[in-house]
């Protein structure tokens, strides 16, 4: 919504709705032919990658499971970045510039993210540097996972505390996401 509010054209893709695979390390993107810098494999991710490489900005989000983004997110990063990464000198074959905003949602509190997750997620942020743009990361922490915790084996969480945190923090998270957009 933030990008649209300043006149940007936007397009939304839900990776869960696509039939896709991660990088197969076929190295066709490293051939000194027409496939250099482009992923050879064709699936639903092909159009997404092409549109990202033609865009000015990529806003991407993923929940964090077991300390990492989803497999679909990883598949996109593999296919998008590996094909533009030069094995000659470590530079980028990509001559354009795509600014990237990364949004992570997680059940963990912000303190845990800062102490235990931020550093491991920095690798993903580094990979986006091959798109030659600015990179902004925003963690949305201590999220509500379900509307009624009593229906689940989740006694380790207090629904009351989760809801209080959401009331305090979620409006700020929305505002920040809008600004980044």
Predicted regions mapped to residue ranges:
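Short aromatic-enriched loop/helix-cap "lid" or pocket-rim segments at secondary-structure transitions
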Residues: 23-26, 114-115, 147-152
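N-terminal beta1-alpha1-beta2 submodule of the flavodoxin-like/Rossmannoid cofactor-binding fold
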Residues: 1-89, 154-181
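Short catalytic/ligand-binding loop motif for oxyanion handling, primarily in non-cytosolic enzymes
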Residues: 67-69, 110-111, 146-147
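Short, glycine/serine-rich, charged loops/turns that create anion-binding
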Residues: 17, 107-108, 142
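Membrane-targeting and insertion segments and their boundary/processing signals
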Residues: 46-50, 98, 147-151
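Short, glycine-/small-residue-rich phosphate/pyrophosphate-handling segment
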Residues: 71-72, 85-138
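Beta-strand-loop-alpha "switch" segments that mediate conformational coupling across diverse proteins
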Residues: 136-147
């Amino acid at each position: 919504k933030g990008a649209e509010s300043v006149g940007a054209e936007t397009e939304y893709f839900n990776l869960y709705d696509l039939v896709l695979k991660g990088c197969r390390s076929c190295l066709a993107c490293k051939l000194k032919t027409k496939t250099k810098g482009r992923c050879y494999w064709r699936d639903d991710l092909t159009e997404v990658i092409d549109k990202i490489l033609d865009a000015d900005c990529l806003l991407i989000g993923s929940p964090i499971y077991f300390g990492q983004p989803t497999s679909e997110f990883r598949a996109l990063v593999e296919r998008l970045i590996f094909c533009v990464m030069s094995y000659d000198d470590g530079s980028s074959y990509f001559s354009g510039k795509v600014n990237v905003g990364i949004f992570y949602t997680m059940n963990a509190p912000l303190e845990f993210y800062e102490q235990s997750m931020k550093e491991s997620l920095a690798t993903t942020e580094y990979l986006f540097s091959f798109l030659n743009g600015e990179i902004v990361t925003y963690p949305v922490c201590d999220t509500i996972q379900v509307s009624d915790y009593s229906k689940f084996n989740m006694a380790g969480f207090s629904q009351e505390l989760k809801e209080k945190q959401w009331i305090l923090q979620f409006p700020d998270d929305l505002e920040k996401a809008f600004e980044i957009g």
